[in-house]
Protein backbone atom coordinates (compact mmCIF):
# COMPACT_ATOMS: atom_id res chain seq x y z
CA UNK A 1 0.00 0.00 0.00
CA UNK A 2 1.26 3.49 -0.86
CA UNK A 3 2.14 5.90 1.93
CA UNK A 4 -0.25 8.46 0.46
CA UNK A 5 -3.14 8.21 -1.99
CA UNK A 6 -2.72 11.68 -3.53
CA UNK A 7 0.42 13.09 -5.10
CA UNK A 8 -0.39 16.59 -3.84
CA UNK A 9 -0.05 17.99 -0.33
CA UNK A 10 -1.39 21.13 1.30
CA UNK A 11 1.44 22.32 3.55
CA UNK A 12 1.03 24.38 6.69
CA UNK A 13 2.95 25.52 9.74
CA UNK A 14 2.59 24.41 13.33
CA UNK A 15 5.12 26.38 15.31
CA UNK A 16 8.37 26.34 13.32
CA UNK A 17 7.75 23.05 11.53
CA UNK A 18 6.11 22.42 8.16
CA UNK A 19 3.47 19.70 7.89
CA UNK A 20 1.39 18.39 5.05
CA UNK A 21 -1.95 16.73 4.50
CA UNK A 22 -3.16 15.09 1.33
CA UNK A 23 -5.01 17.62 -0.80
CA UNK A 24 -7.78 15.13 -1.56
CA UNK A 25 -8.76 15.31 2.15
CA UNK A 26 -9.08 19.12 2.17
CA UNK A 27 -12.54 20.59 1.67
CA UNK A 28 -12.02 24.22 2.59
CA UNK A 29 -9.67 26.72 4.21
CA UNK A 30 -11.28 29.37 6.37
CA UNK A 31 -10.51 31.99 8.97
CA UNK A 32 -11.55 31.29 12.54
CA UNK A 33 -15.37 31.44 12.69
CA UNK A 34 -17.64 31.41 15.73
CA UNK A 35 -16.89 28.16 17.56
CA UNK A 36 -19.46 26.63 19.92
CA UNK A 37 -17.67 25.04 22.91
CA UNK A 38 -18.35 21.40 23.81
CA UNK A 39 -18.63 20.74 27.56
CA UNK A 40 -16.06 18.32 29.01
CA UNK A 41 -14.16 18.02 25.72
CA UNK A 42 -10.40 17.56 25.62
CA UNK A 43 -8.58 20.89 25.82
CA UNK A 44 -7.43 20.59 22.21
CA UNK A 45 -11.05 20.34 21.02
CA UNK A 46 -12.08 23.98 20.66
CA UNK A 47 -15.73 23.14 19.96
CA UNK A 48 -17.83 22.76 16.82
CA UNK A 49 -18.60 24.91 13.80
CA UNK A 50 -21.38 24.87 11.24
CA UNK A 51 -19.65 24.25 7.95
CA UNK A 52 -22.14 24.55 5.10
CA UNK A 53 -24.81 22.78 7.11
CA UNK A 54 -22.51 20.13 8.57
CA UNK A 55 -21.46 20.34 12.21
CA UNK A 56 -17.72 19.75 12.49
CA UNK A 57 -15.50 19.49 15.57
CA UNK A 58 -12.56 21.92 15.62
CA UNK A 59 -9.23 20.42 16.71
CA UNK A 60 -6.31 22.70 17.54
CA UNK A 61 -3.32 20.72 16.27
CA UNK A 62 -0.95 23.06 18.13
CA UNK A 63 -2.47 21.99 21.45
CA UNK A 64 -3.11 18.37 20.38
CA UNK A 65 0.57 17.85 19.65
CA UNK A 66 1.95 20.04 22.48
CA UNK A 67 3.43 22.60 20.09
CA UNK A 68 1.68 25.58 21.72
CA UNK A 69 -0.24 25.11 24.97
CA UNK A 70 -1.62 28.66 25.05
CA UNK A 71 -2.49 29.71 21.48
CA UNK A 72 -4.25 32.95 20.64
CA UNK A 73 -7.36 32.86 18.44
CA UNK A 74 -8.10 35.86 16.22
CA UNK A 75 -9.91 36.54 12.97
CA UNK A 76 -6.60 35.62 11.28
CA UNK A 77 -6.45 32.12 12.82
CA UNK A 78 -6.72 29.48 10.08
CA UNK A 79 -8.86 26.33 10.02
CA UNK A 80 -8.39 23.65 7.39
CA UNK A 81 -11.64 21.69 6.94
CA UNK A 82 -10.92 18.06 6.04
CA UNK A 83 -12.92 14.88 5.48
CA UNK A 84 -11.80 11.77 7.32
CA UNK A 85 -11.82 8.28 5.86
CA UNK A 86 -15.30 7.67 7.28
CA UNK A 87 -16.47 10.92 5.62
CA UNK A 88 -16.72 13.00 8.78
CA UNK A 89 -15.79 16.64 8.56
CA UNK A 90 -13.31 18.06 11.08
CA UNK A 91 -11.65 21.45 11.32
CA UNK A 92 -7.92 21.65 12.03
CA UNK A 93 -6.50 24.84 13.55
CA UNK A 94 -3.03 25.64 12.18
CA UNK A 95 -0.65 28.60 12.42
CA UNK A 96 -0.50 29.31 8.70
CA UNK A 97 -1.19 27.64 5.36
CA UNK A 98 1.98 27.55 3.29
CA UNK A 99 1.61 26.03 -0.16
CA UNK A 100 0.48 23.16 -2.30
CA UNK A 101 3.26 20.69 -3.10
CA UNK A 102 3.46 18.10 -5.84
CA UNK A 103 4.93 14.98 -4.27
CA UNK A 104 7.77 13.22 -6.01
CA UNK A 105 7.27 9.62 -4.85
CA UNK A 106 11.05 9.11 -4.90
CA UNK A 107 11.31 11.70 -2.12
CA UNK A 108 8.68 10.07 0.09
CA UNK A 109 9.79 8.18 3.19
CA UNK A 110 7.94 6.13 5.84
CA UNK A 111 7.18 7.82 9.16
CA UNK A 112 10.14 7.59 11.55
CA UNK A 113 9.81 6.05 15.00
CA UNK A 114 11.42 9.15 16.51
CA UNK A 115 12.79 12.55 15.61
CA UNK A 116 9.57 14.51 15.19
CA UNK A 117 7.59 16.41 17.81
CA UNK A 118 4.50 14.36 16.90
CA UNK A 119 4.09 10.69 17.83
CA UNK A 120 4.61 8.36 14.85
CA UNK A 121 1.08 6.92 15.00
CA UNK A 122 -0.23 10.29 13.74
CA UNK A 123 2.09 10.37 10.73
CA UNK A 124 1.80 9.02 7.20
CA UNK A 125 5.41 9.70 6.30
CA UNK A 126 7.96 12.33 5.33
CA UNK A 127 8.45 14.21 2.09
CA UNK A 128 11.85 15.66 1.28
CA UNK A 129 11.73 19.02 -0.45
CA UNK A 130 15.12 20.50 -1.22
CA UNK A 131 16.91 20.42 2.15
CA UNK A 132 13.87 20.26 4.42
CA UNK A 133 11.51 17.48 5.42
CA UNK A 134 7.75 17.93 5.41
CA UNK A 135 5.93 15.75 7.94
CA UNK A 136 2.77 14.23 6.42
CA UNK A 137 -0.04 13.87 8.97
CA UNK A 138 -2.48 10.97 9.00
CA UNK A 139 -5.81 12.81 9.28
CA UNK A 140 -7.69 9.59 10.03
CA UNK A 141 -5.66 8.99 13.20
CA UNK A 142 -5.72 12.45 14.75
CA UNK A 143 -8.88 11.37 16.55
CA UNK A 144 -9.28 7.76 17.61
CA UNK A 145 -12.68 6.05 17.27
CA UNK A 146 -13.68 6.70 20.89
CA UNK A 147 -12.84 10.40 20.61
CA UNK A 148 -14.71 10.71 17.32
CA UNK A 149 -17.80 8.97 18.74
CA UNK A 150 -17.75 11.19 21.83
CA UNK A 151 -17.46 14.29 19.65
CA UNK A 152 -20.23 13.05 17.36
CA UNK A 153 -22.58 12.65 20.32
CA UNK A 154 -21.67 16.09 21.63
CA UNK A 155 -22.03 17.56 18.14
CA UNK A 156 -25.58 16.23 17.89
CA UNK A 157 -26.57 18.66 20.61
CA UNK A 158 -24.85 21.45 18.73
CA UNK A 159 -26.68 20.42 15.54
CA UNK A 160 -29.96 20.96 17.35
CA UNK A 161 -28.78 24.41 18.46
CA UNK A 162 -27.74 25.33 14.90
CA UNK A 163 -31.02 23.97 13.48
CA UNK A 164 -33.11 25.93 15.97
CA UNK A 165 -31.31 29.18 15.15
CA UNK A 166 -31.68 28.75 11.37
Language-model segments: residues:
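An acidic, low-aromatic, low-complexity terminal/linker signal
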Residues: 1-166
Amino acid sequence: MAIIESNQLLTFKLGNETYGIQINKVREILTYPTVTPIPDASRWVKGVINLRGEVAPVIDLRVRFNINDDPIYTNRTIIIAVKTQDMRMIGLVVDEVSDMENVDLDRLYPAPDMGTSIAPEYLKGLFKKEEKMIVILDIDRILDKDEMQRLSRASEGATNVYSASA
